[in-house]
Amino acid sequence: MQASIESTGNLERRLSFSLPEDRLQSHIVGRLGEIARTTRIKGFRPGKVPAKVIEQRFGAQVRGEALDGLLRETFDAAVREHDLRIVGSPRIDKGDEGEFSFVATVEVVPDFGDIDVSKLTVVRHTAEITDADIDQMIENLQNQRRTWAPVSRGAQDGDLVAVETWSQAGEERLPAEGTEKGSIVLGQGMMFETIEKGLVGLAKGEEKTLDVEFPADWRVPVLAGKTVQVTVKVAEVSEPVVPAVDEAFIKSFGVKGGDVEQFRSDIRANLERELKGALMNRLRREVGEQLIAAYSSVEMPPRLVENEARAMLAQQVEQIRRNGQSVGEIPADAHEGFKEAAAKRVLVGLLVGEVARINDLRLEAKRLNETMRLIASTYEEPEQVIEMYRNDPQLMSGLQNRVMEEQVIDWIAERAQHTEEKLSFQDAIRQ
């Protein structure tokens, strides 16, 4: 098969090719024959259904399947014939040279020139899990299970305070009648600092009027940019009651026997997983920034960037909806605001792929299995999760891509000029 190629842009190519009609017809005839031998149709004995009936019932479907399959096969052959390294999905249209002629418009990988990763400068962060980190996590778990006990003393940091508030902005009272009711844990920045500090020391039934400065962009226009008198009245003060780290508490986290050392060991393993992911994210970001700085002048495939920008917009919209917020009507050009970030993401992705290709880097089975088992270990039935990955090609493909990217990022970092910077666990996981 011969396919002609035309350059229609710096990174765009147009392939013109025709499907071999004899192969298409041969495939259709063969497939209809298979169906005739195996299908059961009422009124006919198996294998004795007339060809005309088979054609009427299955002809259009078989022809469509054959055409799609041969189109993919012929397109792939044309790409190999012209040694094209394409990115994204092709746009395939009907050609002008007959029923079986097609034109495929594709984008290709840009020329990055000599990719010398040894010229990059990368900071590689390290961190370790300490006993103090485990203690902190246990304290966090205790706080997650805390209950609240009413007290008669004045409120202090860490207390849960039920409050009633109302504001006076000039002649206007908010709300016009009654009060706004709510609860806050003091010291967590849930209200204006002036209000939280004003509540410290107040007991149930006590109130105080405070001068509070509202920011210019405050959501209530009548308060925005003004200093307003806010009255707070304490309805209830409760102190936290955290459970003891006893056998029952430990068992509630799935540790059989309630053994404290096993509990700490499990927590360490969880923190190690979290730390490993956080350090890889930092390294991915570090390497990505260096690649962007070194190759930002290289033109990116426009359609690939456009698709990435739309995907980023869709991801943000979905996140907003998951948070229970309304999105409203999305402007047709809303994705334009994501194009700069999309171009950087595309640049890094293509460079990582080129580094892997040029240096013949292959996916390491050991690393893939380790990552799969690491993911599975966070579930109650890890072997079922592993089996799910092995039986789902799409799921496995996503994992393979992720592991391969991490493998290449590591490879680049090892060969770049790099320094190490040690962080605490808390600093390391702070993205």
UniProtKB/Swiss-Prot annotation:
**What are the PPIase FKBP-type domain coordinates in residue numbering?**
158-243
Keywords recorded for this protein, A-Z: Cell cycle, Cell division, Chaperone, Cytoplasm, Isomerase, Rotamase
Q: Write out the GO cellular component annotations.
A: cytoplasm
Question: Where does the protein end up?
Answer: Cytoplasm
One Pfam entry name? Trigger_N
- Name one molecular function that GO assigns to this entry: ribosome binding
Tell me if Disulfide bond is a UniProt keyword of this record: no
Signal peptide: which range, if any?
none
Q: Which GO terms describe its biological process?
A: 'de novo' cotranslational protein folding; cell division; chaperone-mediated protein folding; protein transport; protein unfolding
The keyword Membrane belongs to this UniProt entry's keyword annotation: no
Q: Catalyzes what?
A: [protein]-peptidylproline (omega=180) = [protein]-peptidylproline (omega=0)
EC numbers listed for it are: 5.2.1.8
Q: Which family does it belong to?
A: Belongs to the FKBP-type PPIase family. Tig subfamily.
According to the UniProt entry, the note on domains is: Consists of 3 domains; the N-terminus binds the ribosome, the middle domain has PPIase activity, while the C-terminus has intrinsic chaperone activity on its own.
Matching NCBIfam families: tig
Role summary = Involved in protein export. Acts as a chaperone by maintaining the newly synthesized protein in an open conformation. Functions as a peptidyl-prolyl cis-trans isomerase.
* Record protein name field: Trigger factor
Organism name: Stenotrophomonas maltophilia (strain K279a)
UniProt lists the gene as: tig
